[in-house]
């Protein structure tokens, strides 16, 4: 009987943290880097039915010849004004192709650490991979993961 009571109690908490799937793809050339650190994206990510209308972040890198690690901190502003905060790590590897062109591939892991409004208790993990062309300042990425709202 004690075991049944423990299971009943723990199952209620599990339902309170329903997890949601996340997937986002930025086709090649839709993200641009500039001196003003503005980003243009084709398809906007969606969280709980709301689109991200702006993503501002800081990336601190330790690259040598385009390869190395970086830390990212981002504030995503949703279409209703709510915000989602993230912290991530990036590992980049730059190689030179047979045509002499430099190509940088990367993988990333991002933690959703909190938010405002309806996203105040958001938590989650996203994994991404993609490429960057530092000469043209373009990037493409595929990101997947899951998030939930803690009660």
Predicted regions and their residues:
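Bacterial N-terminal signal peptides
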Residues: 1-10
């Amino acid at each position: 009987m004690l075991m049944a009571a423990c299971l009943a109690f723990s199952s209620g908490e599990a339902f309170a943290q329903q997890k949601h799937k996340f997937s986002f793809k930025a086709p090649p050339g839709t993200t641009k880097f500039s001196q003003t650190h503005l980003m243009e994206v084709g398809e906007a990510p969606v969280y709980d039915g709301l689109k991200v209308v702006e993503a501002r972040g800081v990336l601190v890198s330790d690259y040598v010849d385009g390869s190395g690690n970086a830390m990212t901190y981002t504030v995503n502003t949703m279409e209703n004004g709510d915000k989602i905060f993230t912290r991530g790590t990036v590992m980049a590897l730059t190689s030179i192709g047979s045509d002499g062109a430099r190509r940088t591939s990367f993988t990333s892991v991002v933690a959703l650490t909190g938010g405002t409004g309806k996203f105040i208790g958001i938590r989650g993990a996203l994994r991404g991979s993609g490429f960057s062309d530092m000469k043209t300042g373009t990037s493409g990425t595929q990101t997947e993961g899951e998030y939930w709202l803690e009660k």
